[in-house]
Structure formats: structure tokens, C-alpha cells
Amino acid sequence: MSYSELYTRYTRVWIPDPDEVWRSAELTKDYKEGDKSLQLRLEDDTILEYPVDVQNNQVPFLRNPDILVGENDLTALSHLHEPAVLHNLKVRFLESNHIYTYCGIVLVAINPYEQLPIYGQDVIYAYSGQNMGDMDPHIFAVAEEAYKQMARDEKNQSIIVSGESGAGKTVSAKYAMRYFATVGGSASDTNIEEKVLASSPIMEAIGNAKTTRNDNSSRFGKFIEIGFDKKYHIIGANMRTYLLEKSRVVFQADDERNYHIFYQLCAAASLPEFKELALTCAEDFFYTAHGGNTTIEGVNDADDFEKTRQALTLLGVRDSHQISIFKIIASILHLGSVEIQSERDGDSCSISPQDEHLSNFCSLLGIEHSQMEHWLCHRKLVTTSETYVKTMSLQQVVNARDALAKHIYAQLFSWIVEHINKALHTSHKQHSFIGVLDIYGFETFEINSFEQFCINYANEKLQQQFNSHVFKLEQEEYMKEQIPWTLIDFYDNQPCIDLIEAKLGILDLLDEECKVPKGTDQNWAQKLYERHSNSQHFQKPRMSNTAFIVNHFADKVEYLSDGFLEKNRDTVYEEQINILKASKFPLVADLFHDDKDSAPATNTAKNRSSSKINVRSSRPLIKVPNKEHKKSVGYQFRTSLNLLMETLNATTPHYVRCIKPNDEKLPFHFDPKRAVQQLRACGVLETIRISAAGYPSRWTYHDFFNRYRVLMKKRELTNTDKKNICKSVLESLIKDPDKFQFGRTKIFFRAGQVAYLEKLRADKFREATIMIQKSVRGWLQRVKYRRLRAATLSLQRFCRGYLARRLAEHLRRTRAAIVFQKQYRMLKARRAYRRVCRATVIIQSFTRAMFVRRNYRQVLMEHKATIIQKYARGWMARKRFLRERDAAIVIQCAFRRLKARQELKALKIEARSAEHLKRLNVGMENKVVQLQRKIDDQNKEFKTLSEQLSAVTSSHAVEVEKLKKELAHYQQNQEADTSLQLQEEVQSLRTELQKAHSERRVLEDAHNKENGELRKRVADLEHENALLKDEKEYLNNQILCQSKAESSQSSVEENLLMKKELEEERSRYQNLVKEYSQLEQRYENLRDEQTPGHRKNPSNQSSLESDSNYPSISTSEIGDTEDALQQVEEIGIEKAAMDMTVFLKLQKRVRELEQERKKLQAQLEKGQQDSKKGQVEQQNNGLDVDQDADIAYNSLKRQELESENKKLKNDLNELRKAVADQAMQDNSTHSSPDSYSLLLNQLKLANEELEVRKEEVLILRTQIMNADQRRLSGKNMEPNINARTSWPNSEKHVDQEDAIEAYHGVCQTNRLLEAQLQAQSLEHEEEVEHLKAQVEALKEEMDKQQQTFCQTLLLSPEAQVEFGVQQEISRLTNENLDFKELVEKLEKNERKLKKQLKIYMKKVQDLEAAQALAQSDRRHHELTRQVTVQRKEKDFQGMLEYHKEDEALLIRNLVTDLKPQMLSGTVPCLPAYILYMCIRHADYTNDDLKVHSLLSSTINGIKKVLKKHNDDFEMTSFWLSNTCRFLHCLKQYSGDEGFMTQNTAKQNEHCLKNFDLTEYRQVLSDLSIQIYQQLIKIAEGLLQPMIVSAMLENESIQGLSGVRPTGYRKRSSSMVDGENSYCLEAIVRQMNSFHTVLCDQGLDPEIILQVFKQLFYMINAVTLNNLLLRKDACSWSTGMQLRYNISQLEEWLRGKNLHQSGAVQTMEPLIQAAQLLQLKKKTHEDAEAICSLCTSLSTQQIVKILNLYTPLNEFEERVTVSFIRTIQAQLQERNDPQQLLLDSKHVFPVLFPYNPSALTMDSIHIPACLNLEFLNEV
């Protein structure tokens, strides 16, 4: 393509600039062949003539279209060159605040110098499992790519992080390791991932330091291998270090620091455990005060030191070793501060024996003070014949001291690294690893020494490996697409590497010079000049003979040779090392041990540090103290680097290049000069150049067709094959066939071709735009002319009409004036005439009226005089009549009073007489007579029988007569005594009763009197209050309106707050349940990992039963504690503690219920004991078994009736008291008379029922006593009399027994009457007390009202009104509340009484029926002994009976092996109903163990099924519905009133009778929560792969989303073949499947709503998180697609009647994000609209979307930085969370509302498919 085609008008180019490196310009005219310059317009409108040389290709770089600016991947740019890369990085960094950008396989990371919220757990989970090209560039994306390739390809991976000091290498490596620790968490409980992360603060403390470029610069290189097992869980790690900068220990440049650990230790020197270190502040030590700045802004060294100690502890470093480490570090500081004094001769030095620092140094290391003092100033020379000790000069001593300090620190550094590796080592077999290389980047300073040379040498090796890997990937891509491939020429830095490491290279010559005894840096430099002066990569500086220049891949670097030899030798005198070996501290001696020193530095298994120095003698007999180590530093580094390269070559590398944007560490400040230097040094531009040499732009045929179809002709579009269309179009558009290639699935373009196509597309649009503008302008002019012509005609028409209307108006006015004059004159004359007539009539009327009134007054006076006379005469006659009548009444009253006194006296005399008592006892005597008659009748029968049998019983006749006489005599005596006693008791009781009646009358009179006075006072007060009622009502209305508004607002706020607190509390509880289930699963996993074999359980129950070992309430508290202890023994302390927590919460309620039940239970046990005792006696005495059972049953029923009667009486007393209280309130307030009378009626009815029940109890007692007497009489019979001779005596005994029985009945009746009299007197006393209490209450109320009235009189009228209104309001409020409480209490008592009465009546009926049946059985026992009675089959009562041994079979058939498909077509939740019917039968039989065992087995069986089918949605939903239904059944039939409101009478009969299963309801509720969470997890796992593809990528609206130039070029390693692409219909189908399954399983509708609310939240979270992390998805068309997809989901919710679930509200953030993408983003009003609309999005999310927003074409403007700043300013007031992404793992707390079933238990039938034939219906 010619230059004239490329450089046309409006084309934008890049030109060099001294300040900004590159500057943008625009051509103002086309370039023509032969032109020597281009006319350009700069951005500031400056016109510039830019010279060009087409022959030498010296033309400005072309600028990419705006549509490509801001791309995620630099290789996606059409024009690939330095200015394009720099500009793209600048735009992303400054305008969008994106610090990560891809450059092919390289991740470019720019240090923002600011904490960004993009590294949280939510971001990690968002990138987990995603393809590298699908998400925005991030270090987590690179880590995920490495993890994914390791798992898929089973090949080791490596991440190489490089860059300048301060560029963020350490932070990037740290975040990569954090990602691996999160997604690859260890399966066992070793916490290896925590240890890997804990190694970072340790290595930062001992290996990082503050430099001029970075406050936390790593001064060593490290390679961390993170090991994984076959399941790709972290099992261990290993660290290798390279080239520690030891010189920093003894020297720091200005404004730099030593290693952090020194300053941290000084900051913590005040701690008690560090007093022996003798440390002070860092400024006091020579080695820490070199740089002049000992602090770092924003860094607390003391806190960092504490973190370092915690990390050492976590990694297993003992406290003693930690103290030893800190002693060694402190000794280095003291060593550097030792004062060395030079002698006069200058050749020797000395150290003062009193030097405090030297003493501290020796004491901290445990060495001899004198020896170290001597050998610091002397050295030993060994020859073949003798040994010399030589003094050293001051400089030599300082160098030796510094060398010793560096060596000590290096050894300590190696020891710490070795122990970290031991802590991270694992015994498990490592399957694969991911290595993270954090190594120094290319460095160049004003003065470059040995360290910079080694660093740049390492970067040369890494760059060579990088180039070969990039080249290989490019070649693989071309081969995959089956296009021709030619070798690309790329930079090969092997010659530079050979210059450094080849034989006789720089390092080889350096080692040779180090071996020379008197070798110098100058001699070495001269050898370099001589050997390599002809090399292209080596140069000699013009002005220096001690420096040399190496031409590296990034830049030319000049090295100063001074110090190279000394640093390469790293000499330490052996005498000093020997002193350290003799230390009394084991750690110090171990650091310098011979075995340790002799180990090779390259041994990766034992020594991972590249800075290892060997100190040993050359010969075993003659020690040479000055002999240097055999292996120099350069050799060691070269060896370790080769090993590293071997490791990296055996892995798949991933590259992260860190860029430092500025040297001032300013946040989000970009310096182009510094950035370009680093881009050139780190290989990014080399990657660009390799890509540009081939075909960097790649398009799929589909995307190319959609993007450039505007360039196609109509006839070309007739072809249906898009691939052929693209080929024909490209051949016509681009003439040079070398500029593009057709691959198998993509089209490959040379650099610049996509930009050319974009230019053609833009030209096409520009031409179309011009055509449209021309047509529109012509149309507008025509419309304008037509509008003007129509306006002119209209104006003329209106003018003519106006003139005609004005003439007509003038004529009308003239005619109207004449009419007005005529009418006015006529009106004036008529008014004058009417005035005269009206005056005449008025005068006549007044005159006539005067005469009429005068006559009327005279007649009226005569009439009134007559009336007065009539009334006076009548009054006189009435007065006389009344006086006579009063006199007659007085006489009559006196006579009647006299007669009444006489009658009273007679009544008193009669009351004292015995006749009265006899009349009272008439009824009693009648009963006695009846009993006597009965006795006489029986005697007659007895006499008749005795006469018939006299022949046989003549010998006993005399005895019988004697017994009869004695019996008669005894009866007479007893009756006489009893009658006298009863008469005396009745007389005393009547006296007391009369006395109580008289007192009651007195109190009633006093009460009536006081009540009358109070009513009068109340009437007066009400009269006064009546005056204030109107004003009160007005004020009340105002107050009510205000209070209503305030209360509504406050109630809404309180409701919201309470709902929020409830949700939080429920969420916390369910999270605890979830954690509990996780701990349970973890426990099972640990148990499974144990050595397999038979393990004996400590109890007879299985281990699974212990999981839900909850006792029922019928057991004692001791049993509960024993069960809890058994749980601790069976399942461990942790789990039992959690179970005990739930148990203790419920135990409080259990105790309260047990206190109430203990009394009844004690009575029951007593009755049972009596019954058992009676049975034993019956067996011993040979009595009938049936008769004894009846007696025991009657005794039990009697006790129950007595207890219930007492309870009923107490309830009636409470009801009476409540009624009396309400009556008192009614008397004081004169309100609610109807309710009072209603309650009295209810009380009367209750009393009547109580009396009836008392009579029934009396009858029952009599019958029971008769049975007892019969049994006692049977026991007293003579056992030795034979049957023939004893029968007559038996008859006699029966006769006597009847008499005694009748006597006891009379006594019992008398006692009953006495009890009734006592009860009545007590009732009267209680009534008197109530009346007194009422009087007192009325008095207090009167006093309060009087005080209130007095206070009111003292106030002003306005205040009185206000005070009165307030008092009235408070009074009415209190009364209303009291009435409500009373009504609720009465209603509750009424329900309770009715229920108890019903139960009482039923039990009485049962007792009567049972007794009648027993008597009938006894009567017909002999007749029916040989007859077989066939029992009629009873109705099904809704219970299922099973044997204990069938429990396992029941659980297996009904739970473990049950498939949901087996129950299709049956009642939903059938297993739950069957289980409840089994529980009900166990309750019916009062079998506590059976209930407990069945419930425990059921719960554990469900858990086992769910664990087995942990990914089966249908099975999980099946058991969720059954567990919830089982829980509802336990509530519905528990007997609690709150759960029985919707039950039918039949259902109430199915309630549990003996057990309270409240604890098990809580266990089932927790199990339901666990099942629900598992259900949500399964559903989310099925939905999540569809969400991103369906919601963001699929085109729901065809043709809406335009295609823009591709972003990241997805590598073949990043993609999985055959990736699924989902559409919205797939989500809808999956939702339909979920809904169908849930409905078929009979799950409660409320739970179904919550399930879909959770699923829609997950859809919202995943979609929004991906939207926030994908630049290609943030466009206007994506917003339209999203809104359409959401509307389809909302329509589905409405179609399924799920729109009330709150699911739509969970989608609100996504809805607002879609609207944000579609809104205008230009003006201030647009910003306000966005802020008001996007209330569910946080500030960070809004800003992130705006930064990511990308136009689809160049005609749409980008969002400006100023607009984003405006949005941020307006949203500053928001208190938004700092989290960018939504928590996709969040689960709403589930609520299981009570949902009773309408089915009755007796209507449920068991299908045969369940194989439950062993269950028996009861």
C-alpha cells in the first residue's frame, strides 16, 4: 500500500517529542509522491512542517483509530509500534484507572502507588474458572491460567514477575500466591496455604529495604515452588533465593535504609524480652544511620516486627530460636558501631577493651571477647615454612569487620530460608507445582557495579527464554490455523550471553583475576579490553580505563570495574570464623559449621541461597587463613541461574512485567520517559515487534462479516457462505495478498491492515453521512419554503377579516346606543311612580297596626288574671290533701313496725329450736329411711332364704340372730351419735353464715353509699369535662393526624429496622448451621482418612444415631445430661459442644414445662404403684384379675378427675377475679355494661357446670369406695371354711357389708355438705375482700382526680385545656389497653376452660362406660367363660405400628433406598406422613426409646442420602419437601394452641399425647436449612455456566450488537475445545425444570419463592461481576441486550406467579447497570440523572462501568474523565461499601413458615411399591 493512500488528509500520526516522547498530530492535506514534508496540525492547533524521507522509511508512525484505543491487549492494536503501546497504556492507566494490560502472553502491571479494592476474595472467585481472555487483565487471570493449564495439561507452570525496583514485583507475586492459596486450599488440616502466605512478611523483613525508588524493595531474587497433589490442592512449598545484596548490611546510599529487620528490632527494643540485646534507636548505630533516614512514612516498624514474630511462630520457629536470631541481628548492629583506633604508624589498629559495642557483640554471640578483639585487628599469614601474625591498617580492619558482618547476615539469611522450606515441606508426594519467580528487573544507574552486572546478566537469560517462548506460541497459532509460516526475525541475545558466561568471557576472566594473588580491578579491565574489544556487545568508554560497556538487549550499560574482584571473592578471614564456630550458642555455631560450609551452593535440597560462602582451609594440615573460597560469587550465581533456567524451561511460563510510572511515587501519575525506558527493558516492545513481524490482527469470519458488511456490495451478500464472502471482499479491498491470510477459523492481517479497513469503513460512513446530510438539508429547505408561503397567505386572510369585523362592530355600537337611551328614559319615569305608591301604602299599614295592638293587649291582661286565680285555688286544695295523707302514713308505719318486731322475735325463737334443724335434715332422714328400707328388704330376703335352708344351717341360726341384734344396736347408737354431732356442726355453720351475711350487708351498704358519693363526684367532673369536649375533640383530631403521620413513618422505619435485624440474625444462625454442617463433613472426612478397620462403638447404638441424640421431654434432667455426655464420647468435644449449645437453649423451656407436669406425673406414678401393689395382693389372695384392674383404673381416673377439678376451680377463681376487676372498672368509667353482663353469664354457666361435675365426682367416689369395701371385705373372709358350710355366712356378711356401706355413704354426704358450706363461706369472705379492694381503688382514683382537678385550677385557661386533653388521652389509652388485656385474658381463659371441660366430660364418660362394662363382665363372667367373642374391626386411627427390630428396614425402604420416581402419582411428602404416623404410635404406647431411636435414625438416614446424592437436584428437593412436611406435622399435631388454630376436630384427635418433641423440631429445622443450602448449591452449579454466555454474550436481539475490533487474542491454551454457548432460553428451560421438580415434590410455595429469589440473586451477582470485569461487555448494545434478557426473566416470574418472591428486587443492581449503559453521559444534568437512578449500585461500581464503557464505533463519543470526576463528586456523600464486586456466594437466610396440612392421618394409604408390609395400621 502506497504512502499516498496511507497519509491522507485527517490522518493522525505520531511524531517524536522531547518532553512527552511522542506527540499526536493530524495531516491537514494529502501526501503526494515526491513531497519532502508533511503539513501537520498539533493538538494545540499549531501548524508544523514535518520532514519525511520515503526512501529510508523515515515517516511518522500512524495512529490507531479511536475505536482501538484503550484495548485490553496491546497486540490487538492495528498499528504496532512504540507510540501506540505507550499511548494505550497511558489512556488505560490515567483515564480508566486500569493498572493491568495484556501484551500477548505478557501481563503489563503498572504500579498505581495506591491501594485498590481489586484483590478481595470476591474478585478471586470471579476470576476462578474463567478463561484468560474473557475477563479484564488481572494478576488473578494469569494465576488462574497457570492453575488451569496445570490441571488440564498436567504440566508444571511458572509465573515470572520482573521489573524495576518499586514497580510492584513483590506485591504481584504475593497476590499470585494468595490466589493459589485460595483456589487450591489444602484438603487436609495442615494450613499449608497460610504458611505460604506467612513466609512473605519474614522474607520482606530480612530481604527488603527502602531505596530511593521503592520503600519496600526486594534486594534478592526468589523462586517459590507451590506444590500440588493429584487433586490440585496445595500440599507444600519450597523457596530458592538468588544474590542477596549483602553490601546493604554495611552501606546504604542517601535516603535509603538497611534491611527492615534492623529497624523493626530497634523499634521493639523496649520490650522486656529484648533488654539483653542492649539496643536503642536506629540512629545510634552505624549500620542503620548511613542513609540518614531511618523511618518510612506510613510504616510502623513495631507493628511489622510483631507480624514477623507471628509469622515465625506460625512456621514453627521456636521461641528460643527466635531469640537467637534477634541476638545475631543485634550483634551485627553492635559490630558496626565498634570504634577502631589507628596507631601512630598507620599500619596497625586497636580496639579499646572497654568498648561497649564489642562487649555486647561478644556476649550476644557467646564468643571470647579478647580473641575477637585481637583478630579484628590482626590477620594470620601462612607459608610453607612458618606462620606470621600481621597487623592491619585502619581501612583493612574496617573492610574485614564489614566482610564479617555481611557474612554473618548472609549465613543467617540462608538459615531462615532453610527453616522456612522445612516448615513448608510436606511428606505427601508432589504431583505438580507452580513456580513464582520474583526477580529483579533490568537496572541501570549512574554508577553500576557488580550487583547490577549480575542482575542484568540474569535478565539477559530470562529475555532469551521469553523470546523463544513467544516465538513458539506464535508459530503454534499459525500452524493451528493452517496458514503458511515463515521464520520471524527476532532479537537473539545469545551473543551477549556468550560475552558474559562463555569461556574467557567476562565472568571467566573475573574468576581468573581473583585467583591471582595480587590481582586488581584495573588489570582485569585491561584483560577485558584486550580480549573483547572486537565484540559487537562490548565497548570501551573513551574517557575511562577502569570501566566497560555491555550492549544488553534493553540498553547499553556502563560498568565501573572498581570493587568487582572484592565482591566476587567475598573474603572473610578464617580466624574470625573459627571464633564464631566456638560459640557457646548452638545456633551461632551451626551457622558456620564445616559440614554446612562444605555443602555445594547449588544443592537445592539443602541450601536454597545463592549467596552461600564456603570458608575452609585448602589443605588439611596447613590452614591458610587468607585463602578465598574456591567458588566465587559469580560462579555460584551462574550455576544457580542455570538451574533456574532448567526449571523454567521444563515448565510453561507466564510473564508479568511490572512498570514503575514515576519516580516520585505519586498515585496515578504517568511519566512517559520512565515508562518507555522500562517497556524497552522488560521485553514488552520485543513482544510487539515479534507480533508485528507476523499477522498480529486476527478476526473470526463471523466478526469480520458483521463489522465490515457495510463495505460489501449487494451481489456479494447473496452468497450464504460468510467465509467466501469475506474472501471475495478482502481480495477486492486489499490488493496485496501478503497483507492477509485465511486460516481455518480466522483471518490474519498484517500490521496496519485493520486500521486501513477501519479507514475504508469510516470513509464509507462519511460518504453516506454526506449523502444523508445533503438530502436532509434539501428537504429542510423545501419544508421551510412551504411553511413561509402558508404563513403569508394566512396573514393576508387574517388582515382582511380584521377590517371587516371592525366595520361591523361600529354599526352595532351605534344601534345599541339608541336602544340604551330609550330604555333609560322609560326606567326613570317608572321608578318615580313606584316610589309614591309605596310611601302611601306604608303609612296606611302602620296606622291600622297601632289600633289592633292596643285592643289585643287589653284582652290578654284579662285572660292572664283568670289563669292566676285558677292555679292559686288548686294549690291550696292540694296542700290540705297532702297534710292529711302524711298523717295516715305515719300511723300505718308505726303499726307495721310493731308487727314486724313481733314476727322477728318469733322467728329467732323458732331458729333456736330443734324442730328447725329437723326440717333442715328432712332430706337426710329420708335418705336414711330409704337406706333402712333397703336394709329391711334385704333382711326379708335373707330371712326367706334362711328359712328355706334352715335344715342345713340350723347350727348357725342362733349366731345369725345374735349378729342381727348386735348390728341393730350398733346402728342405733351410731345414728344417735351422728345426728347430735351433725346438728351441732350445722348450727355452728349457720351461725357463722348469718354473721357473714350481716357483715356483707354492712359492707354493701357502705359500698353503695360511697359509690353514690363517687358517682356524684364523677358526674360533677363529667359536667366540667363536657365543657372541654369540643376543644378536646378538635385537639384530638390534630394530635391524631400528627401522631398518625409520625407513627406511620416511625413504624415503617422500625419495621424496616426490625426486618433487617431479623434477617441478619437469621442469616447468622443459618451461617452457624452451615459451618456446623461443614465441620461435620470435615469430621467425617478426617474419620474416613484414618486407618481402615473395625472400630467398636461405645454404645449399642450406631455412630450415626449419635448425630441426633436428643432426649424427649419425658426423661429426667439426669438422663439428658447423660445423653449429652454420651454425645461427647461418641462424636468428639467440638461437635458435642455445638449440640449442647442447642440443647441448653431448649432446656430452660423444658424445665418450666416439667415443673408443671411433675405434680401430675407424681400422682400418676403413685396411682401406678397402688395399682401394682393391689395386683400383688390380689394374686396372693386369689382374687379376680379383671376386678383388680377395674379398681386400679377407677382409682387412677379418680385421681385425675380430682387434680383436674382443682385446676378447673383455680381457673374459675381467676375468671371470677377478672370479672370483678372489670366490674370495678365499669363502675369507675360507666362503660362496657354489655361485656360485664356477658362475663357474669359465662361465670354462672361455668359454676353450673362445676356443680354438675361435683355431683358426678361424688357418684364416682361412692362407686369406687363400694369397690374398695368389697375388696377389703373379701380379704377379711375366713379362708378355712368350706364352700357348702360358708355360703350362708357369706350372705350374712354381705348384708352387714351393705349396711356399713350405706353408713359410710351418709358420712360422705355429710362431709360433702360441710365442705360446701365452708367453700361458700370462703367465697363470701373473698367477695368481701374484693369489695374492700374496689372501695380502696375507688378512693385512690378519687384522690388522683381531685389532685388533678386542683392542679388544673392553678393553671391558665389554655394550659387547663391542654392538660385536660392530655389527661383524657392518657386515661382513655390506659383504659383501652386494660380492656384489651382483659379481653385477651378472658378469651384465653374461656378457651382453656371449655377445652378442659370437654376433656373432663369425655374422661368421665369413658370412666362410666368402662365401669359399666367391667360390672357387666363380672356379672356374666361365668356364663361367657366358654364363649369366643368376635371383635368388630375398628376404624383406622392414623397410626402405624412397627416392631423395634423392623426399624432399620423401615429406614432403608422409606429413606435410604427410596427414589422420588417411585412415589409419582401419590400424595406429596408421603414419607413424612408415614414417619409421623409411626412416631404417633410410639407416642401412643408411651415408648420414649422408640421415639428417640426412630427420629435419630430418620435424621441420620436423610443425611446419608444427601451426602450420597450431593449433586442430585431432584433427590435434594424431594427430601427438603419431606423434611419440611415432617417438621410441619410435628408442629401441627404437637398440641400447642398456636399450631392448632387451623386443625379440624378430627386432626386434633391425632395430636401427640405423651411427648413434647420441641427439641427434635429444632433439629429438623437445622437439617432443613442444610438441605436448602445444598439445594441452592446444586442449582447454582447448574446455572452458573450458563449465566455469562446467556446474559452477556448471546445476542437475544439479533443485529443489535455491532462488532468492534477484537480485544485479547485468545491463545489455544486458554480455550477449551467445544466450549458451550448458552442462550437465555437455556436459563429459562433450566428454571422451568427447577420449578417443575419443586412443585411436583410438594415443596411449600413460600420456600419455592425463596429458592428462586436466591437463584435470581446469583444471576444478578455473576452477571454484574462479569460486567464489571469485562471491557468488551460495557457498551450501549450490551445494555439493551441485558434489559431485554431481564424483562424476559421478569415475564417468566410473572408467568409462574413468582413475582412476589423479591427476585426482581435482587436484579435491581443489574437493571440499573443496564440503564447506566444506555443513558447519556455528557452534561451535568446527565450526571445528576445517573446519581438519582443508580441507587443500588455503589460509587465504585458506577465509576468502574463508566471507565469500562466502550463505544462500538468511532461516531459514539467516549465517557470523558471530567464527567467521571463529576459523578464521583456527587456520590461522595454516599456511605457505600468499599467492595467492588457483589458476593456471589451470599445466601439469603431461609425461613420455613408454618404450613399445616389439610390431610388427616387416617386418609393416607401406603402404596405397595414401598415394601412396608410389616407396618400395621392401628
Swiss-Prot record:
ATP binds at G163, E164, S165, G166, A167, G168, K169, T170. PROSITE patterns: DILUTE, IQ, MYOSIN_MOTOR, SH3_LIKE. Its main location: cytoplasm. It comes from the Eukaryota. SUPFAM superfamilies: P-loop containing nucleoside triphosphate hydrolases. Residues 1496-1773 form the Dilute domain. Residues 765-794, 788-817, 813-842, 836-865, 861-890, 884-913 form the IQ domain. This is Unconventional myosin-Vb. It comes from Mus musculus (Mouse).
